[in-house]
Every structure is written in structure tokens, then in C-alpha cells.
Amino acid sequence: MSLPEGALLFVYTGDGSKVLGGYGAQNISHSGTIATQPIETDDVVIEVQAPAGSSPTLRLSEVNHGIRPLNLRATFGSNFGRASSALTCTPEVVCMPGLDEMKRAVVVVVINGEGVGSGTMVSTTEGGNTPYLLTAAHVLSVNFKYMNIEQQAERTVAIFNYESPSCSGEVMPDLTQSVSGATVVGFDKPTDACLIRLNNVPPESYRPYYMGWTAEKHPGGNYINLHHPYAMTKRVNYYNGNVKVNVTCETDQHYFDDHMHYEVPAWDVGTTAPGSSGSPLIDRAQRVMGGLSAGKSYCSVKSADYFFSLANVWEQKREATENIVRALSPRGSGTLTCDGRDPYGSLRSRARRITHVSSALSGDSLSGQGAQLSSEVILGDADAVGEHYLLKPHTQLYGAYVMLDMSQVKPNELGSEDVSMTLEVYTGGESPAATIPVDLSKIIRGTLSSRQDNLKYREVFVSFPQPIELSDRGELILAIPTQSLPKGVSILHQQYSGAGGQMMIKSGNKWTPRTLTKGTIALWMDPLIGDSEEDQAERSYPLFSLTSTSPEQILLQLADRVSETAELGIYTISGQKVYTATLPSRATILDRRMLEGLGVVVIHVTAGSEQLSIKALFPAN
């Protein structure tokens, strides 16, 4: 297969109700193949859309048809927007601060269209951009059912950034950021460790991160697990105790050697599920210790999960384990730790997504932030609508995320023709610096078919063919001509006084701010920008943050810069002491019930020379 610049490949059901893609040239492996995730259908259409005059080539080499459904409670998109009750205790990663780098390393792993797990992009002691992916051996072999592991690796798809942009999980994320095909580096059944090398380096627009690792036997306490349960959006678990080492993984089938695993006795926040296998156990230093092999944890039942141990991989002297060690630590097994790195960190800038919509950081539903206005109200009689950003001069733009509301689309008015919209990028001039067509046909039809699962909101990622540089003024408007939006499709937005963004409307050649009587509107259109080293140094984060993880629990997280213990004090507004404690870790679970009914309380944290107080309201029930 070969795809010219601008060409896209789609795979969809005969009725267009389920869609995979579009896949571009960046998704093709070195061997010229694209492996796709499974799609539930008995008839399938493979379509290539290419610019006029180009010459794409396509050969269908193999189709795998399963006669039994996948052993998954959810596949991509199903159950989206109403997370299974089995997952209510494991939060969406966007809800939790401090995970910016780590979450970019964790991917969905799809094996030959049949098996699904999680994996982690990992760094090496020599640096470089080699795309090593750490997962579990039982993931690559689909529970050791298929031992032709080289073929399994070649048919592997790694999907990046599959995470909801909203805490409420109402927006289905883009699924096109994938890399297909890999080569086996080391596959070790006794430990369950598996390292593969992707056939292509993830492009910069994917914002990949290669996480550090540790082969130390007893790394420090306070652990994180990032995972894709049931192949759903990325979630996070926390454990504040100490893991058990050299335990025997308890499974129905005795796959692994005894005394090879870490045991997490019970998560303080979270649970795992099918699809979480291979996901990383991460220590306080943000290094991978191993990957999930098996578990018994549930939200309703606190029980153990088991992770293969890189420390035990380092101690084995088999060919497979030595290949893993040699790849991650070319100088030999004497090196036991490696820091994480951004593979594009040596460039002038790194890709970073920014947004004006605060609901991305809230546990409230989008409707709770202010009901979505109709397309007619938002668009009015304007020629175009856009979201205005004022950034640093000469900032580089790599792409944009647009969140669309498809709840008002009527299938009988859609027709059979292709449906598209246009994204325009203004950098200060009267004319757009770039005009990019965006095909929505498959996305809209796929969303409509899944409306029973509340998939009415959809994230669309638009990758720019070439980076766009802002002018000396640093002005940016991401815009959509109103006539290009399909009937019934609107742009997700936030409307209330004090919203962080600024919607603009264009009439003729003039842009003016759009406001309501109650305040401003922010269109949910997020640029992907180059974040320079200076920008990263200038960004500051609060000393701590609070996140409600359940009706009974609150997660208090300290900033990464805190390297010592911190002191916590909680007081009523009149100064009465409610609770004090020493915080030995960056993540601490507080019992929300001790605060209910107290009204306004002051939560105060001191760490070294820094201190911060936050007021919070806990009304009586």
C-alpha cells in the first residue's frame, strides 16, 4: 500500500454505521501495510480518498472474520459516554493533574483485530528515538493462544491519545492517531514481559512520550497505573502503600513462573479490567516497574492485581530477557534506572494542546456547564465563527482539535453524499493562512448509529500538512465557515460569565467578539502548538490540587516539584481544626465524609517554603 500526501483510508460497515479511520501515510508500516482494530460487521467497505491526480495503491492481503464476539465488555465507542458501572471508581486521566507526560506514553494495543490490551512507550539509557513498546507477553499472544509472535507483532496496532477530553466522558475522542506493525525484541512467558519495536516512530503531532523505567527490586512507594480497561478511554489508579515483591501471580491458568510478580494488594483509587493487561505500574519517580499480568480488583471489591517485574526480568538469563535488557540498557544489566524523555525534545519546540474550555478539567457534565445552544443561535447570520487565541509571537501550529455536537443531526436529512466541513486558520490577516477540508461523512454516520450510547459529541483531530507559524502579534483564530457545517452539526462550546475563551464571528472581512447577556462564549476548538523550553519553564502549577474521585473520596495531589513531606491542615471558616496530617506522598486520599455538612472549609498545605490555602464548600445533605 502507498498513500500520497492528503490521501485517507477508511474501513466501515456496509451501512456506514461504524467507521475506522481515516488513516494516512503516517499509519503505514515499513512493510507497506496497515493493520486496523476490529470492527463489528458481516460486510465491510474499504475506501481510499485521494487528491485529484494522485495515484494511491491498495492490495487487500488478508481479512480475519471472527465467528464469536471478542471477549470484551466494550469495544471502541460502545458504552462511551456512560462508563460501565464496573469502572466508576477509576477516573478519566483528564480529571487528574500531574499526568501530562506519563499519559502520553500509554497506548491501546490491538493484536490482529482479536486481542486488546495496554502498553507503554519506554526510553533507553542511550536516548534516541527508537519506538520501544512494553506490554505483557499474554497480550501479544492473546493469552498464549497464538505463539507465532512475529506475525502477531506485525499485525499489532498502537493507538495513541485515546482519552476523553472531558471528565464526564461525554466526548468520544479521535481514533486516528495510530501506528501499525511491530517487531518482537523480547517475549518471555515465564515473567510475562514483552518488548516490541514499532515499525514507525510516532509523528510529533501524536505528542508521544517515552517513559522511564526501573529494574530496582524495591522502588519507593506511592504507585500509579494508567490503563485502557475494556479498550475504553485512558483511566488512572492510585495506591499509596508498598507493593509486595516476588509474589506468585494467581490466575486460573498457571501461565507464569512462581515468585516473579509485584502485587498491589488493593487500589486506594481505581480498578483494572480486561484491556488493562500490559499497562504500567509506575513508581513515585514516574518510572515503569512492570506491566499488568492479572488481577482480581473491582470497584465493589478491593482485591489484588499482579504486575510483571522488570527487576525479575533483569535477573533472568534467558535469551528473551537478555534481549529486553540489551535494548533498554545497551551498556548492560548493571544500569537499573532510566529517566523518561520526549523523543522530540531536542527540537525547538514540543507539541502541546491548549484549550479555553474549563469543562475539560471538571467532573460536571457538559450540560451542567451550560446547555448547548442550537446551531442557529451560535452561527446566526455570520459568514464564519471561530475561537480567538493570543499566543507568543512565531508560535508553531501543528493541528487542531474540534469538538462537534451532532445531537441535532437527522438521518433522513443527511443524504448519501459525502459530508464535510472546512477549517480555516487566521494568523492576523484578512485571508486565512490555511484552509483545510475535513471529511465528516463516516464520523457523523458512525456517531448517529451509536446514539443509544450517548455518542452525540465527537472529537475531530485535524493535522496540518505543514506547521503554520504565527506572526509577530501571536494572534490566532481557528474558524469554520458557517456554510461548511453540515445541517444539524454545531460546535461544542461553553457559555457562562468568565469563560476562558473568546468566540469570534466574521461578517465580510471583519472579526468581532460574540457575547451573550450572561457573559462570553468559548468554542471548543483547541490548537496543537509548539511549546518551547522557555514556555515550559515559565508555566507554573499550584502547590496542590483537589479532585473528587467518588462520593466518599477526595484525591489531594502535590505538585511534582515537591520533593519532601508536606503538612496538611483542614479548618472551618471560623478557624476550628478539623483534620491535620503529614503527607508523605504526592497523592493522598481524604475521606470526604468527615467534611460533609461543615459548609466552607479551608484546606491548607505547607511544603518547605511554599504554602497554599484553598476554600471548598461541603454543604449539609
Residue ranges and their predicted role:
Residues 35-54, 468-480:
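Noncatalytic modules at the cell exterior or secretory-pathway interfaces
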Residues 120-130, 270-292:
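Catalytic nucleophile loop of clan PA
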Residues 269-270, 278, 410-501:
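Aromatic- and Gly/Pro-enriched, solvent-exposed loop/edge beta-strand patches characteristic
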Residues 338-429, 481-531:
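Beta-sheet-rich sandwich/jelly-roll-like modules and their strand-loop junctions
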Residues 398-399, 535-570, 587-596:
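Glycine-centered coil/turn sites that cap beta-strands in beta-rich domains
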